[in-house]
Amino acid sequence: MTFRSWVVDKDNQDYYGGDQDWFPDEWARRAGCASVCAADMACFYEHKLDISYPDFLELMTKMFKLNTPGIMGFPYFYKFAKNFKKYMKHIGLDVEPIYQKITESPEQGVHLVKTAIDQGHPIGMLILTHEAQILEEETWHCMCITGYE
């Protein structure tokens, strides 16, 4: 299941969500994944399902200021959630994050994802380490999950 999501129109092409490579600043391109995740989630909750590239980049930049990464990136999911909630309240929306620091089993993780998606909520996920080869390039990375198969 995947819910209707936002589309970023950049150079007459549609993109499903943002890309940290769009940041003009090199550091943001390297370490701005939490900012892109937050911008993706904000678009969903604000019902901005079609957004221009300049507007999305502006939102990414706002989120970068809220979630400025340090030398190790931004591996602080409680702080991420607090900052996101604060931003949403500032624009008049109330969200309540649900935290799952560690799952006891893969099945528990799948259940968490499916439940959130089925209830219409995107998931901001931070993967610091993982044993799965398929996720090798995605460690120490934040992403927005909007569906499952």
Q: What is each PLM-predicted segment?
A:
Residues 1-79:
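Active-site-adjacent structural segments surrounding the nucleophilic cysteine of cysteine proteases
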Residues 2-7, 60-149:
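Conserved active-site-adjacent core of cysteine acyl-enzyme catalytic domains
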